[in-house]
Amino acid sequence: NYYAYDDGSAEAAYGLNANGAKLAYRFNINTTDTLRAIDIHFSQVMEDVTEEFFYLTVWSSLDPETIVYQQSFQTPYYEDSLNKFHTYLLDDQLILNGTFYIGWVQTSSEMLNVGFDKNNDASSQLYYNASGTWLNSIIDGAVMMRPLFGDTIFPYVGIDENQSFVIDQNDFILFPNPTSNKFYITTNNQYNQNTIGEINVEL
């Protein structure tokens, strides 16, 4: 359910070092489909940039520049295994057909360092904009960023959607608590897709 130019192995990393820089990766689909998420493999090759925000962005065109989706306050995430992708779920369903571009808009000049496959050349599909003009990448290779399509990106687990069940508070652990940015959940429960709501309390 994904499209890829890379082979899943990063030999290097690719990044832009300009505040407000944009990176766009061109894909083309022949039939109408629903974009659900974007997989990105960020490589920690230099400094930790997991607190650097970017706008996850989808374009339908770069000339003229037409943004059809943008999701703010995203940060690079380093997965705990070699060459593993992190899935950025879209907040809304996005129906696409034909040519589109996925990528990001930076909010700082820090290089985010996406994994770069040097064995497959997709430079003709990769564009960047650091000074107001979109340019084609001149570096041979493929960034490790993939669009995910379909009705759902989660496998069916055989649970009736009307079935209810109770998770005891001892079934999971949330840490760290408190936190101002990221948190993690570990659970022994067989149901691994959860909904997290927001509760604001003022004293």
Q: Model segments located where?
A:
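Aromatic- and Gly/Pro-enriched, solvent-exposed loop/edge beta-strand patches characteristic
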Residues: D48-S124
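Boundary/junction segments of secreted and surface-exposed precursor proteins
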Residues: N1-G15, Y156-N162
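Short beta-strands within extracellular/lumenal beta-sheet-rich domains
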Residues: L16-I29, F85-H86
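Short, surface-exposed beta-strand/loop patches at domain edges
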Residues: V105-Y156
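A short beta-strand element within beta-rich, extracytoplasmic domains
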Residues: D33-M46, W104
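C-terminal outer-membrane/trafficking sorting elements
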Residues: F54-S60, Q163-L203
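Contiguous beta-strand segments within globular domains
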Residues: K22-A24, D33-D39, S180-Y184
